[in-house]
Amino acid sequence: MNFKYIKKDG
């Protein structure tokens, strides 16, 4: 999973 991307989205 790409937590970095999720953080940017969330």
UniProtKB/Swiss-Prot annotation:
On the 2D-gel the determined pI of this unknown protein is: 6.44, its MW is: 38.6 kDa. This is Unknown protein from 2D-PAGE from elementary body. It comes from Chlamydia trachomatis serovar L2 (strain ATCC VR-902B / DSM 19102 / 434/Bu).
